[in-house]
Design a protein with these regions (language model features):
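Sec-exported extracytoplasmic/periplasmic mature domains
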Residues: 3-7, 40-48, 72-80, 117-125, ...
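Structural detector of well-ordered beta-strand residues that form the stable sheet scaffold
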Residues: 12-13, 53, 130, 154-156, ...
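Extracytoplasmic ligand-binding site segments that recognize negatively charged/polar headgroups
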Residues: 30-34, 38, 51-111
Length: 234
């Protein structure tokens, strides 16, 4: 479908790339690098090591696949290789950390909560839960609260849901990796506006306009949330 679109008009992608679509460029973050940043938050929360489960909507899209692999490679102290892919369904062990499972919920919030609850029961020594999509961390917090495991099992997240940021303020979430969707939108419109005028100079040379991810913890969550409210007018 996207290849057909690309033949008929100016096509760019943002947030999640589709490199095989003949799009002119991708605007967003490096999801593999963001995954490694997420893994670094796990290491900071569990300096002595521990067991981890990753939660995500699905792995069929590049952003999810690359985030997950970045987390895994960071925890296993591997070198950078965005093309590497560890298939789910196997336990991955390093010197200090082990990834017990990757659980996919197909964007079903009830299923996401059920998977979190099941993980808490199935793995009584579970150390950390990592949520790769925006809705995952708040749902993980709900499951942990019901199980009386808040602060016992560490939570690391992605994106800037209010529940996630409040969790960081309350000490229930160790940290989250955030994107800059405001900048994504701004740069995408800027590029499309120039392309519509026939100006291709606006395109990045390698086809990727990198808008870096940021790591949010208790040290900077208040300032970040204030900035976010200003940008969104909330």
């Amino acid at each position: 479908f996207l290849k057909t679109v690309a033949k008929k008009t100016k096509l760019i992608t943002q947030d999640s790339d589709a490199p095989g679509s003949n799009r002119l460029c991708y605007v967003g973050m490096d999801n593999y690098e963001a995954g490694r940043m997420c893994g670094q938050l796990v290491k900071k929360a569990l300096p002595d090591g521990g067991s981890v489960i990753i939660f995500v909507g699905r792995l069929g899209q590049d952003n999810a696949k690359h985030r997950r692999q970045g987390v895994i490679d960071e925890l296993l102290d591997r070198g950078n290789d965005p093309k590497r892919y560890d298939k789910p369904g196997q336990v991955l062990r390093g010197d200090k950390y082990e990834i017990l499972d990757t659980r996919t919920d197909d964007f079903d919030f009830a299923k996401a909560k059920s998977l979190a609850q099941d993980s808490i029961v199935k793995y009584p020594k579970l150390s950390c839960m990592v949520g790769l999509f925006a809705y995952n961390p708040p749902i993980l917090l709900e499951a942990l609260k019901s199980a009386g495991k808040l602060k016992t099992i560490k939570v690391i997240g992605f994106d800037e849901e209010d529940g996630t940021l409040k969790g960081i303020q309350d000490g229930d979430v160790a940290g989250t990796i955030v994107q800059n969707p405001y900048k994504y939108g701004y740069e995408s419109v800027r590029i499309l506006h120039a392309l519509a005028k026939g100006d291709n100079r606006v395109l990045p040379k390698d086809g990727f306009l990198n808008i870096p991810a940021r790591s949010i913890t208790s040290a900077n969550v208040d300032a970040f949330w204030a900035e976010l409210k200003m940008l969104t007018g909330k």
